[in-house]
Design a protein with these regions (language model features):
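Flexible gly/pro-rich beta->alpha loop and the following alpha-helix that scaffold active-site loops
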Residues: 1-25, 30-44
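Short, conserved clusters of charged catalytic residues that mark active-site
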Residues: 8, 75, 137
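Pocket-forming structural segment of enzyme catalytic cores
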Residues: 11-15, 35-111
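Alpha-helical elements of Rossmann-like donor-binding domains used by nucleotide-donor carbohydrate transfer enzymes
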Residues: 12, 114, 140-144
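A residue-level structural signature of the nucleotidyltransferase/glycosyltransferase Rossmann-like core
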Residues: 22-25, 45-46, 63, 88-89, ...
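Short, surface-exposed beta-strand/loop micro-motifs that present aromatic residues
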Residues: 113-120
Length: 149
């Protein structure tokens, strides 16, 4: 958020998102959609999808969570279809979306604890994993987003 502030793009980005414009946030691009982030210090997010970004709670985990992991769909839609359920995607992260409404979670993943891996509000999507590094399933997700958003 500090870099977005330095670049003076927080206001235009919020205006863009408030118009329910199409957006796909990847990793940190998803995390900035939250209300608050708790990395080095408490930081206000864009507040588009209510919730907080906090570090994994399980101290026994290897952090960052790096590698392939399965997503489990809560519900599908035009972009995130049933074809992605139980498929592996590539993750690299230490922080997760918490205190989020279930209605905003399209998919979750388990890594020591259950966490949202795909979130949505209107035309705004966020994915915690890296679809660009996730082989055919990731490319399929990006293709769906481009063609259907």
């Amino acid at each position: 958020m500090s870099n977005l502030k330095k670049l003076k793009i927080i206001k235009p980005l919020k205006e863009y998102l408030e118009n329910n414009s199409s957006y796909l946030g990847i990793c940190v691009g998803m995390q900035i959609l939250s209300d608050w982030g708790y990395e080095d210090k408490i930081t206000r997010g864009l507040g588009v999808i209510s919730g907080d970004i906090k570090k994994f709670r399980n101290k026994k985990l290897i952090i960052p969570h790096m590698g392939w992991n399965t997503i489990n769909l809560n519900k599908d839609d035009t972009i995130i279809t049933n074809s992605f359920d139980k498929k592996d995607f590539y993750f690299v992260h230490s922080y997760i979306f918490q205190n989020i409404k279930k209605s905003n979670v399209l998919a979750f993943t388990h890594y020591g604890q259950k966490f949202p891996s795909i979130v949505k509000k209107g035309n705004i999507y966020g994915v915690q994993f890296h679809p660009e590094k996730s082989h055919k399933h990731g490319l399929s997700l990006i293709k769906n987003y481009i063609l259907k958003s």
